[in-house]
Amino acid sequence: MSGIPLAPIGTLLLVACLIAMLSRRLGLPYIVGLVVAGFLIALLPSSPDVPLSRDLIFNVLLPPLVFEAALQLDWRRFRRELPLTSVLAFAGVAIAAVVVAGGMHWIVGWSWIGAALFGVLIAATDPVSVIASFREMGAAPRVSMVVESESLLNDGVAAVGFAVLSAIAAGASPGAAEVVPAFLWSLGGGVLFGVVVSMAILLIVGRTDDPLVEITLTTLAAWGSFLLAERFHSSGILSALSAGLMIGGFGTRFLSDAGKDRVHSAWEYFAFLANSLVFILIGMNVANQPLMELGSAAAIVAILLVLAGRGLSIYPLAAAFSRSRWRLPASYQHTLFWGGLRGALALALALAIPATVPERNAIIVTAFVTVAFSILVQGLTMPMLIRRLRLAKGHNEPPVAAPASAG
């Protein structure tokens, strides 16, 4: 156990509990409080030493967060919005990545591969940040579903695109005949592993009525699906997402009466622990970045490009659905735009950039600055926007127009 910094982690979790209590009393977003607390902790003469690594984020903290988010989704609502959220996730990530990559290359002068890697890693909104924020605010059901679903899906899309670009940056020179199958396998394989693992787990769960066993088995589903997919070069994020959706959507048929509530409660607790560590560590690491680079021209340009890319990936795509059953009211579009928070995934991918990329250090610093802006500025103002747009629970949701009839 000597390799695990138990005392520092315990200290950070104690701070997280105090921040949770204080944030609720002050009516501030919890994740904003965590980042600020982490920043202040890092300025202390003797702060807890818990390094924020790619492996810690990607292999330890992300699987339970993605799984829990998918587990809590309403399967019927998710399926109903899937045509819309799929387009926003796939096309949206591509548009945002192109905007950011082009800007960082032509304006800042980064190499194409460095700009492309940054464009992809920062294009996806982070489900951890988005879902934590929206649950706290009590946003209306449909806008929450669209934002959360799109965030979960584009998470997986961005991770797959990043893996392809990383292979190129590391020296591989795959042609289209290799890239396309690899991309499709990463997507399809991730979903396949998630479905297979979750169904196998549910078959075992159906043979017990012990809630503790049920919780343990769902824990194996979360990490097992993620690690298995990664082992076979598929998307672990999509695998954990698929497993969570399957267990959340069909688990009621297999879980015992006592197990249903306890499984969900256990996963809310796991997510609280992972969320707490992720955002405190983000704050600590932002404080440890070189001060001059935090306000550099590259960081400012990146923030502006990220916002521009997000806008171009939301408003035109939403317009394409304006005469369909998936029409998004303007208030929803504004919420999707400003609610596109960045977080742990962007940092995990930035830390995984190959050393052969000349801008690697600059990309890491710029990613930290962009994430900090996203959480502190966008996250802090989201509750006000939700209230302003009258999208909080208790207000009537805007009506969805029926498809226009032909002729």
Predicted regions and their residues:
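Transmembrane helical cores of multi-pass secondary ion antiporters/exchangers
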Residues: 1-407
